């Protein structure tokens, strides 16, 4: 019984393996149209080892099914190894270029430099902000503010310059004087001409009061203006300039 049962069980085991191999072969044939059954040693040279070098199909019980070709792994002991040097404990003469360049950049880059200290505050006197170089003069019998004459130059004039200057003074004295303080209109509006036009609103007609405010020595030929000097000139262009006038009503 046992001898008869053993061949039957062996046939059952082989049939199961055959069915499994055929099932694997059919599944592989569905994915590979060039599937061919294994016909023995002509296709599978190492049929006994389960390898098929021709089509990379594993032969199992007479059928070739597609699997990856078996390659035994190399033991770890046989792999080539490279010795890793131990970290040196003593300092070496080598430096890391990236670190040194970074430190150099952070040290000398203008972006990372501290800002320059601010300048010390400069204090000034309020009186220096106001220019007080004007004086009251009686010009052609009118009281007006005029700018003071600049300090005379230290150099002496040559005889030619002196004669030319005297001729200019005599010419100015013979020239008829223009009343620059007269109003262009007959209006009696009072006030100070702050706009800076070439004429003023009105001036004081009282020459006696003007004579008290000014002296004869203050009056000079330079105080009289030529007719072509009616337009207002800036201080940089003229030494003498009418800034504003004072009007008094008696």
Curated annotation (Swiss-Prot):
One of its GO terms (biological process) is circadian behavior. Residues 201-250 are annotated as: Disordered. InterPro entries: UPF0524_fam (IPR029670). The keyword Cell inner membrane does not apply. Keywords: Neurogenesis. Residues 202-229 have a biased composition (Acidic residues). It comes from the Eukaryota. Belongs to the UPF0524 family. May play a role in neuronal and neurobehavioral development. This is UPF0524 protein C3orf70. The lineage of its organism: Eukaryota, Metazoa, Chordata, Craniata, Vertebrata.
């Amino acid at each position: 019984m046992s001898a008869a049962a053993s061949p039957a069980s062996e046939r059952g085991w082989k049939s199961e393996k055959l069915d499994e191999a055929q099932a694997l072969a059919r599944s592989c044939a569905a994915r590979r149209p060039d599937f061919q059954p294994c016909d023995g040693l002509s296709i599978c040279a190492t049929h006994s080892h389960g390898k098929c070098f021709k089509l990379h199909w594993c032969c199992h019980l007479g059928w070739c099914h597609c699997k990856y070709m078996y390659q035994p792994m190399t033991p770890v002991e046989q792999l080539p190894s490279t010795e890793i040097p131990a970290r040196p404990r003593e300092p070496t003469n080598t430096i890391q270029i990236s670190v040194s360049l970074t430190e150099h950049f952070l040290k000398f880059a203008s972006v990372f430099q501290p800002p320059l200290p601010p300048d010390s505050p400069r204090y000034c006197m309020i009186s220096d902000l106001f220019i007080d170089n004007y004086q009251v003069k009686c010009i052609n019998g009118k009281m007006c503010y005029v700018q003071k004459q600049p300090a005379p130059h230290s150099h002496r004039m040559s005889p030619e310059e002196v004669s030319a200057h005297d001729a200019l003074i005599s010419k100015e004295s013979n020239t008829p004087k223009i009343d620059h303080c007269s109003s262009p209109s007959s209006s009696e509006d009072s006030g100070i001409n702050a706009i800076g036009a070439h004429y003023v609103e009105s001036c004081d007609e009282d020459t006696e009061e003007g004579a008290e405010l000014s002296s004869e020595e203050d009056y000079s030929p330079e105080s009289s203006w030529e007719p072509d000097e009616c337009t207002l000139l800036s201080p940089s262009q003229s030494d003498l300039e009418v800034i504003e006038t004072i009007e008094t009503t008696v």
